[in-house]
Amino acid sequence: MAAKDVKFGNDARVKMLRGVNVLADAVKVTLGPKGRNVVLDKSFGAPTITKDGVSVAREIELEDKFENMGAQMVKEVASKANDAAGDGTTTATVLAQSIIAEGLKAVAAGMNPMDLKRGIDKAVVAAVEELKALSVPCSDSKAIAQVGTISANSDETVGKLIAEAMDKVGKEGVITVEDGTGLEDELDVVEGMQFDRGYLSPYFINKPETGAVELESPFILLADKKISNIREMLPVLEAVAKAGKPLLIIAEDVEGEALATLVVNTMRGIVKVAAVKAPGFGDRRKAMLQDIATLTGGTVISEEIGMELEKATLEDMGQAKRVVINKDTTTIIDGVGEEAAIQGRVAQIRKQIEEATSDYDREKLQERVAKLAGGVAVIKVGAATEVEMKEKKARVDDALHATRAAVEEGVVAGGGVALIRVASKLSNLRGQNEDQNVGIKVALRAMEAPLRQIVLNCGEEPSVVANTVKAGDGNYGYNAATEEYGNMIDMGILDPTKVTRSALQYAASVAGLMITTECMVTDLPKGDAPDLRAAGMGG
């Protein structure tokens, strides 16, 4: 086992604080509308330029192992805030740095670290309740656009695009961010249900100019099995040909003789058919087939429930107004399924979302809800260079998470004002002893830190602005972009309550643990190995 280096008491805490300060100082230059960028070197390709706090934090690794431990613990604050709300990572880092610095001063002055932590925790619990009381719902498009704009570093086009996307696919809809091809940002909305499976044969294409298959008012056959024998398909094909409508087959696979016969029938114009593979794998495929059946008013032909393809009738088929299939995707538009059945299916999936344990499962279930309930919106980010594209994409992602958080828990006045109002309301909060009271004061003083940092990044004097804002009440605050005072809500400077709450809770959680640290243990750096190249040579 490798030898260890151990540091105790003040020696350990000073080293740890130095690491905290290096990471926090690198992150906090990005805070606010006039925050600066950070350039991150990459082992290959062009450097990345970012104004996203968590991206900066993730890159920092220090040489001194004790300092690095401090930095890594604050990195955890930024990551947790990012996971919970998708934004507020820089605010969380600034809060953590302030609580740790003030808390360690109090420990050095002889306060009991455990009581300090209890005081900090008490202040944070009370602050979260006050934040909830200050919160107002965020329901209209204007407020959603304002939240998106602030989170995307005052980029109004991004805020408007996100509001428009939410308008079109609903607040539960899936909104994804992709690289665009031009210089402008674009919004692309896919209505209906789209899944990532294309046609099984290019011979099905009936719109050569777009390379797509378009079927008007088709019957939709859903089969949870491989189809390779054309005999079991004949009754269905004959019934569809009599009805004079096209047919879409969605099955585990269609191959061999069956696929060849379908292609020949299509080319001769006997019956218009297209076949695609069912989306997903295993249990997820079964669930998605059932989703499509609900949407189109059909039945999944599955041998598990004793149904045979040969006995399928037109009553078992789903129907839709239109289906568009290209090389990679299939889109079903306006399925004829009953609204009550669709809502019941959506409620069932939502229940599964609540019980899901992994983020991946939750995300996939959320996508299924969106496909059934609304649609999918894609924001295509435009930029002149790849470096700018990466930076902008990160900002749009942040803005998207922030707007979702705002819809979920409401909004409070932005620019650090909400935390200052909370701190002033809690000025009479007391603990069980004097050390706890100091802990409460440490937490309340830290709540001023985000506003002070925003002002500092503007090149103004933090104390002057902080005192002016404290002298006001309600939503009165400082607009750092225009350098004016006024009502933050009226000026459109909003922060999602969830983002502010998560930042405060995670900062206090990690900072409290660091204040109560008395000993740090790490591996000793390995010394230079002796040069043995000439060992054993004769004299």
Curated annotation (Swiss-Prot):
Location (main, coarse): cytoplasm
Q: Which GO terms describe its biological process?
A: protein refolding
Q: Name one GO molecular function term.
A: isomerase activity
- Catalytic function, reaction form: ATP + H2O + a folded polypeptide = ADP + phosphate + an unfolded polypeptide
Q: Enzyme class, one word?
A: isomerase
Zinc-finger found in the keyword field: no
| SUPFAM superfamilies from the UniProt entry | GroEL apical domain-like (SSF52029), GroEL equatorial domain-like (SSF48592), GroEL-intermediate domain like (SSF54849)
Record: residues binding ATP:
30-33, 51, 87-91, 415, 479-481, 495
Keywords for the protein's UniProt record, in alphabetical order = ATP-binding, Chaperone, Cytoplasm, Isomerase, Nucleotide-binding
Q: Does the keyword ATP-binding apply?
A: yes
Q: What is its EC number?
A: 5.6.1.7
> Family per UniProt?
Belongs to the chaperonin (HSP60) family.
Describe the subunit structure: Forms a cylinder of 14 subunits composed of two heptameric rings stacked back-to-back. Interacts with the co-chaperonin GroES.
Its job: Together with its co-chaperonin GroES, plays an essential role in assisting protein folding. The GroEL-GroES system forms a nano-cage that allows encapsulation of the non-native substrate proteins and provides a physical environment optimized to promote and accelerate protein folding.
- What this protein is called in its record is Chaperonin GroEL
- Species lineage, top-down? Bacteria, Pseudomonadati, Pseudomonadota, Gammaproteobacteria, Enterobacterales
